[in-house]
């Protein structure tokens, strides 16, 4: 079983946490380990979330860790993903169980497909 680490504990990260618990593979292929966020107090006002494990800059991936970014800023997302990949981390996609896919759809690693999303055939 893999351990999902969500990079970013802001609003997008909390949304992704909820979606991941209803995603294909949850509880069978992965469980949620926690968050990486530079702000250790990012979740202090919220209950029911996994812990912040540290900042992306300081985290060393464990062998069973897999990652997904939940950062709205594209430059920050790319920077944090590169930091984790440089240390051997791998990214997975989170696909909500209610998503619908046509023929020949390709979803790349690190993608987040939300609930009720629909993809037409031949989408890449």
At which residue positions do the language-model features occur?
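Glycine-rich adenosine-cofactor-binding loop
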Residues: 2-20
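Short active-site oxyanion
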Residues: 3-4, 31-33, 64-68
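Short alpha-helical
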Residues: 11-14, 41, 75-76, 106
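Structural signal for interior beta-strand "rungs" in well-ordered beta-sheet cores
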Residues: 93-124
């Amino acid at each position: 079983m893999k351990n999902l680490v969500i990079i970013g504990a802001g609003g997008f990260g909390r949304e992704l946490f909820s979606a991941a618990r209803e995603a294909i593979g949850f509880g069978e292929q992965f469980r949620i380990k926690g968050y990486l966020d530079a702000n250790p107090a990012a979740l202090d006002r919220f209950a029911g979330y996994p812990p912040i494990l540290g900042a992306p800059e300081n985290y060393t991936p464990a062998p069973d860790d897999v990652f997904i970014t939940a950062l709205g800023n594209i430059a920050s997302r790319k920077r944090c993903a590169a930091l984790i990949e440089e240390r051997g981390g791998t990214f997975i996609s989170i696909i909500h169980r209610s998503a619908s896919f046509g023929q020949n759809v390709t979803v790349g690693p690190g993608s987040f497909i939300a609930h009720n999303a629909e993809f037409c055939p031949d989408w890449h």
